[in-house]
Amino acid sequence: MDQTKPPRRNPLAFTPWPVTLITAVVYLAFVIPLLVIHHVVPSAPTSSPDGLNITEAWNDLQVLTAGYRPYNSRQNDKIHDWLLHRINEILGAAPPATTDEKKPDVFVFDDTRSNLTFARDNLAVYFEGTNILVYIRGEDDDQEQWWELPEGSPKGKGGVLVNAHYDSVSTGYGATDDGVGVVTCLQLVKYFTTPKNAPRKGLVVLFNNGEEDFLNGARVYSQHPLSRFPHTFLNLEGAGAGGRAVLFRSSDAEVAASYMRSKHPFGSVLGSDGFKAGLIRSQTDYVVFEGDMGLRGLDVAFLEPRARYHTDQDDTRHTSKDSLWHMLSTAVATTEDLVSDTSDRFDGPARNDHKIASGTGHQAVWFDLYGSTFVLFRLHTLFALSVTLLVVAPIVLLLTSIILTKVDKMYLFRTSIRPEGSLEVLPLYGDRGVIRYPFLLGIPTAVTIGLAYLLTKFNPYIVHSSQYAVWSMMVSVWIFLAWFVSRVADFARPSAFHRVYTLTWTFVVMWVLQVIATVYQDRWALGGSYFIFFAYAGTFLATWISYLELFALPRKSEYANHLRPVSRHASSHSSRRGLSEEDEEDEDEAPTESTSLLGSRQRTTFANYVRVNADTADLSDSEEHTQDVNVYGLEQRWSASLPKWLWLLQFLLAAPIVLILVGPIALLLTGSLHQTGQDGSSSLFIYIAIVALTTLLLSPMLPFVHRCTYHIPLFMLAVFAGTLIYNLVAFPFSDSNRLKLFFIQEVDLDTGLNTASLTGVQPFVHDVAVGLPSAAGQNVTCGPFGDRFKCSWTGIPPHVLTEDKPVEEWLSFEVSRSIDKPRHAQLQISGQNTRACKVVFDSPIKNFHVAGSAYDPRFPHTYAKGIKEIRLWSRVWDNTWTVDVEWFNPDSSSDHSKTSGSLTGQVVCLWSDYNQPGTIPALDEVRQYGPAWIGVSKLADGLVEGRKSFEIA
């Protein structure tokens, strides 16, 4: 057959245009839907399902978010009363029982009795709750009202708890934090009191108050008798302002299985690992229910955008009915599955003393696929599969290599071959491309890391508003450099083994990553590395196919014998050249009209060396002009036997699985972290995370990128140039992506001096502070405050009392030292128009007691190293707290001993009600005169703190 006759074009061949088009189409086909799903919330139904009313829920949300409702505000009391009214309305409108369907019994508890003292590290809290509980009795529940008995306890299987908190921060309307959760709970009451939806197991719906100020409401719930009934829970939260509700924590696989009922699942176990590893520092009521009380449950929350979280943009204008429906539908589906479960999997020995006997489950791995399918399996299953594949995959590749060697088809790593019965050495060039991978991977990755440091130095917060500009910059330069390096390598040393060597290197790297991931799975129960396992499996299969592909090659001995019958001219020419590509050039043929303008088929490299197809050096003059059309370019002649379409199978094994699993993680991680720099988190971390994710997402194209045409890489170069300039010079904040600054005003009630301050990142916080009218002409002082800077100035005096009184009357306290007990004293503290005060000690105290307080061994109220601060919360206004304290012996060897027996500190009261204009003029001023690109949030529990000093001699 005439090898010079061009074959019919194969649309799947490993040639530039098919590779370019297929690679681009596959990446776009998987990435675009991910972006759409991440940013577009499923539409709410036009008509409400039976037992639910979306319009009613939206109207409730508008009422709920009419004002700021922190625990320490009058608006909070109004919402408490409104919730009781709405619950009674819903129960009154519930459909009546029928002959076939029984209406469940419902009990509403307005808990104005429970209180608790607890401590965490050197901070102690006394809290009086105003939680509202709705108990919908299940068909299988104990029919007695056991909670009314002095020692009453529930019988039978445990129930289900659904929780949302109805308080908000003092600077935010709390539409998603946690208004959507609250109205979802109201709809759950409506749904499960409909006779046909009556639960098998009892349901407790908790509207807790005080979450924003240290998870106080959830902790005090533990003191209600009904808290002993639920064994599982669903916590509804918000740490953003819209979008999809994300499942970001689950205690085990068994309870996570109930989430599978959700029509639009969304989330990854990687979020749970972030909490375990301490990367996410904020907490929700989940840690109280699961960690302190021993329940097993789920944490579902809105996570982005963080710029609106805890600000006045967390309102109904910036969320939607679609977001409301996403959380509501998820809650209904999950709760319905939990209350229908009659198995014993949520019953068993308590994990610790005094905790709920809910048994133990199995660590879980979960993630969603394109927002429609929920994948769930146990962590030990992932561990077993990981260990198995870590052992099996290298063995399979090793055995395949041995078989290839046995059948004389192992061309890999072979530079030459000596034909049998001959002293002549013939080149194979099978080692070409073996060391390319470190450069292919290392150069693009190193450059993107350099860009991460460049942005951190010159414009660290650009990711706050322009995360996709950062992504575009990283992706475009990575693609261009990977293509450029591979093309240079392919130009200088063309090799048909580029794919197999690159895949082999990738396999080795993935094997190392899988070892690390498996160790973390075993030691720290972190399942977020699941994507590494699947990527490793895909890489292994693609690599194995490359090795199996070698069986299509001729035996090396046969190939060598094919090369032997050459002319003496070729032999002498070959011996002159040896095996090096850098030997002298062939003598140029005489030019004719048909001669190429470049002269023969040789090419000159950048070092002025001749680029020659090595195999043509071993051919006779006649054979040299008969190039096999099945050989691509100047690659090795034996590559003509390799299949031309297997690359597509390898690409489909390696790339899509990475895009499907790593893509959502990249979007979720970016969405939840790109605006955390304003909170003091490292900007470099998010940039390095983007670099790592870019490398993971694009590395599957490395075995194939050298075949791509120049069109897309050059376009990527243009994109890189534009985005680099933008990312370096653009202002990082905007009206829709505001910088969050944190406000507090501190008043010295002994002297009347007040200091207003803003806390945030430099230089922006200073620029905002000095631009305020009241700060004009003042020396605005800025200094480090944790990971941020705090800028202070003398502010406009606040008006936090309902009537004008001297500041020294805002709070009062009396101190009396015990006569018969050394180092004991009693403080009586009262604040005007507030129900929150605290005592801050200059040195830690040993012990304390608040009159009327309850104690619970699950919540220790002391700390071995002493207590520095006691926070006091009352459900009534203008309350007087009585606090007995004991401090350390100054003569003891304790680290906290003082040189004298005195105790010093400050009594502080808080004011957080910002619903009336003019109450806190300094905050009004920041909002009125601050630039449009800032948002204001609270720095501490109170917007205004008034303090007086004390000394107990």
UniProtKB/Swiss-Prot annotation:
Q: How is its cofactor bound, per UniProt?
A: Binds 2 Zn(2+) ions per subunit.
Cellular compartments per GO CC: vacuolar membrane
- Cleaved signal peptide residues: none
Show the ranges annotated as biased composition (Acidic residues): 581-591
Methyltransferase: present as a keyword of the record? no
Residues of this chain annotated as glycosylated in UniProt: N53, N115, N779
Cofactor (UniProt): Zn(2+)
Q: What class of enzyme is it?
A: hydrolase
Query: What residue ranges are annotated as transmembrane?
Result: 17-37, 383-403, 438-458, 465-485, 500-520, 525-545, 651-671, 685-705, 712-732
What GO molecular function terms would the record report? metal ion binding; metalloexopeptidase activity
* Lineage: superkingdom: Eukaryota
Q: Which GO terms describe its biological process?
A: proteolysis
**Which residues bear the site annotation Transition state stabilizer?**
Y309
Active-site feature positions: E211 (proton acceptor)
Quote the record's binding site residues for Zn(2+) 1: H165, D177, E237
Topology feature Cytoplasmic, residues: 1-16, 404-437, 486-499, 546-650, 706-711
Q: Which InterPro entries match?
A: Fxna-like_M28_dom (IPR048024), M28_fam (IPR045175), Peptidase_M28 (IPR007484), PFF1_C (IPR053975), PFF1_TM (IPR053976)
Could you list this entry's UniProt keywords, alphabetically sorted.
Answer: Glycoprotein, Hydrolase, Membrane, Metal-binding, Metalloprotease, Protease, Transmembrane, Transmembrane helix, Vacuole, Zinc
Q: Where is this region: Disordered?
A: 570-599
* Bilayer topology annotation: Multi-pass membrane protein
Family of the protein in this entry: Belongs to the peptidase M28 family.
Q: What does this protein do?
A: May be involved in vacuolar sorting and osmoregulation.
Q: What PANTHER family does the entry give?
A: METALLOPEPTIDASE M28 FAMILY MEMBER, VACUOLAR MEMBRANE PROTEASE
Record's protein name: Vacuolar membrane protease
**Which organism's genome codes for this protein?**
Emericella nidulans (strain FGSC A4 / ATCC 38163 / CBS 112.46 / NRRL 194 / M139) (Aspergillus nidulans)
